[in-house]
């Protein structure tokens, strides 16, 4: 699997696959001909940007890599790893399994209640979800962190000396030019309010903001 993400992703990928792939909608998959073989192309990614993920036989991977880099050489295409991907998904406010999501997390804890309708029936775990919908739940918020030290996963969030939540993801944001974090709070957040994050024993002020931090222009 090779992913091409960013505002010029479509233009670059279509140079290898042909124009028909440009009609593929987000979260859809199609067969494409690339480098003389049939592959899968999905209009997916976890960066908050437009892009494609290309699924090819393993032995074709190096050739596809070289072809993509050549196709995007004039458009600033550069190779990046998971750290860059994770920073982009953080800026886009996208929850990640192992950070914001777990086996114990419900859709109501992460602002995804719109994705489930347990009362309509036909849903695996529907009864449990319906019960969870009536119970108190956590809230995901964004934090603008003051100072130069970033908040990391697991750092406590406090208000008036009380622990009210935990940082689930945090990193410096190249787009915003400051440290940001996603936190799970145990109460309804006040957007624009302030909390303190325990960063290695030092309480650091942070401003509560709505997610996402960044939304790509359409």
Spans of features found by a protein language model:
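Conserved, structured C-terminal
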Residues: 1-218
């Amino acid at each position: 699997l090779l992913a091409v993400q960013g505002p010029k992703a479509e233009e670059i990928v279509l140079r290898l696959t042909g124009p028909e792939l440009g009609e593929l909608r987000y979260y859809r998959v199609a067969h494409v001909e690339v480098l003389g073989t049939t592959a899968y192309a999905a209009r997916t990614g976890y960066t908050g940007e437009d892009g494609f993920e290309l699924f090819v036989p393993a032995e074709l991977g190096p050739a596809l890599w070289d072809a993509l880099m050549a196709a995007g050489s004039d458009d600033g295409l550069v190779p990046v790893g998971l750290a860059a991907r994770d920073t982009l998904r953080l800026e886009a406010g996208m929850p990640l399994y192992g950070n914001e999501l777990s086996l114990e997390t419900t859709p109501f804890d992460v602002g995804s209640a719109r994705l489930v309708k347990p009362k309509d029936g036909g849903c695996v775990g529907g009864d449990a979800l319906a019960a969870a919908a009536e119970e108190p739940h956590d809230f995901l918020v964004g934090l603008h962190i003051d100072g130069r030290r970033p908040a990391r996963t697991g750092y406590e969030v406090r208000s008036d000396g009380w622990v009210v939540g935990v940082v689930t993801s945090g990193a410096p944001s190249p787009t915003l030019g400051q440290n940001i974090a996603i936190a799970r709070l145990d109460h309804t957040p006040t957007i624009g309010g302030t909390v303190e994050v325990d960063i290695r024993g030092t309480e650091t002020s942070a401003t509560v903001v709505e997610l996402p931090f960044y939304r790509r222009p359409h």
